[in-house]
UniProtKB/Swiss-Prot annotation:
Stated name of the protein: NADH-quinone oxidoreductase subunit D
Swiss-Prot/TrEMBL catalytic activity: a quinone + NADH + 5 H(+)(in) = a quinol + NAD(+) + 4 H(+)(out)
A Pfam family of this chain: Complex1_49kDa
Primary site of residence: membrane
GO cellular component: a single term: plasma membrane
EC number: 7.1.1.-
Keyword Phosphoprotein in record: no
Organism of origin: Leptospira biflexa serovar Patoc (strain Patoc 1 / ATCC 23582 / Paris)
Encoding gene per record: nuoD
Length: 406
């Protein structure tokens, strides 16, 4: 892969002497409303892909450097804008990292709600991935078939956080606010409607002969190559590797719920789609085990040095006002050291490596974003295939530019 500012010189040297009959085709920069701004310069011989150069950096926003300037709660505005299709998963991953650094134990109520929102976000992400993949291959109706259910999940997030997309969900030590009274009832209604909708979507798209011919055996990758590239999440499991952070390195209460890990066979575009279909059903299974068991209790830990007190108490209590002032002006202080924590985001292992010197901001932040590794493998996965198959491969990898470039 190359950064965008070097492409002119780089491509001029690499593709200077093309064999007779070969052409250069730009796949992208694509419109931001699709998968984000991505570009691939593809050398073709007829309809066959000979070579590919992937370009990154079009939406690079210096998030890691911003992490060294913002305090630990403020960095949520950056995690919101990584994989913007399932923002709560990014937020929860960051907050869990900071709580691990500070050894904060949140109430069970907080953990239950975080897990439920995580799985709802995973469902949203997979709906978009599989739905948009159908659109990219010419089947538009499947996406619309599930959009109603995705909208219902957005309404849950809007009521819970005040925002649909950039939710800044959670705070260090808990949640910004408690769940609303109809939270559990509305989620049960969503699950009730989503189950038959997934079955219908599968019949409409996945079982479609044309879709199968466009995706079966296309853009495949072996288990060994996937591991070598650093794959994780649905794309690794589609290659036949049953690895999931929720199972293999459990966090929150994932070791206390029952769910299966779907795996594929050849890591093809079809396998990646089928794995995501089954993962949506497994996410619903997890939510069903949690939704009726949300315990009573506070929505934050008893950590006044890191969690803002409620506004009504700030206005009437001197101690609460002091805590409020200290947190806003001096931030959350984290013990010195190096920390890494990973969670299973919708695209795979999302990890945060943080170096702290005991200040209100990290000394260094690095984000292990799963899309970065998939995009590196893309040229190898499409080499020798048809130009039209590059679209199916890219869609099934679910490369989100906001997460890729950070």
């Amino acid at each position: 892969m190359v950064m965008y500012e070097k492409t002119a010189e780089h491509f001029g040297q690499k593709f200077k002497d093309l064999p007779e009959g070969h052409l250069l085709v730009n796949l992208g920069p694509s419109h931001p409303a699709t998968h984000g701004i991505l570009q691939n310069v593809i050398q073709i011989d007829g309809e066959r892909v000979v070579d590919t150069e992937s370009v990154i950096g079009y939406v690079h926003r210096c998030f890691e450097k911003l992490g060294e300037r913002y305090d630990y709660n403020q960095f949520l505005v950056c995690t919101d804008r990584m994989n913007y299709v399932s923002t709560p998963l990014n937020n929860i991953g960051w907050i869990l990292t900071v709580e691990k650094m500070m050894q904060i134990q949140v109430p069970d109520r907080v953990t239950y709600v975080r897990m439920i929102i995580s799985e709802l976000s995973r469902i949203m992400d997979h709906i978009i991935c599989n739905g948009i993949m159908g659109v990219d291959l010419g089947a538009f109706s499947g996406l619309l078939h599930l959009f109603h259910h995705r909208e219902n999940i957005y309404q849950i997030l809007e009521k819970l956080t005040g925002a649909r997309l950039t939710t800044t969900f959670c705070r260090v030590g808990g949640m910004e606010r408690d769940i609303y009274p109809e939270f559990q009832t509305e989620i049960k209604l969503i699950l009730k409607g989503l189950k038959p909708a997934l079955d219908e979507f599968e019949e409409l798209l996945i079982r479609n002969k044309i879709f199968n011919e466009r995706t079966k055996g296309i853009g495949g990758i072996s288990a060994d190559r996937a591991i070598a590239y650093g794959f994780s999440g649905p794309n690794l499991r589609a290659a036949g590797v049953p690895w999931d952070v929720r199972k293999d390195d459990p966090y929150m209460f994932y070791d206390k719920v029952n769910f299966d890990i779907p795996v594929g066979e050849d890591g093809s575009a079809l396998d990646r789609t089928l794995v995501r279909m089954e993962e949506m059903r497994q996410s619903m299974k997890i939510i069903e085990q949690l939704i009726d068991g949300i315990p009573e209790g506070p929505y934050h830990a008893d950590v006044p040095h890191s969690f803002l007190p409620p506004k009504d108490r700030v206005y009437h209590n001197m101690e609460e006002l002091i805590y409020h002032f200290k947190i806003i002006m001096h931030g959350v202080k984290v013990p010195p050291g190096e920390y890494y924590h990973a969670t299973e985001a919708a695209n795979g292992e999302l990890g945060f490596y943080v170096v702290s010197e005991g200040d209100k901001s990290p000394w260094r932040v690095h984000v292990r974003r799963p899309c970065f590794w998939y995009y590196q493998a893309f040229p190898e996965m499409v080499k020798g295939g048809l130009l039209a198959d590059t679209i199916a491969t890219m869609s099934s990898l679910n490369v989100i530019a906001g997460e890729l470039d950070c």
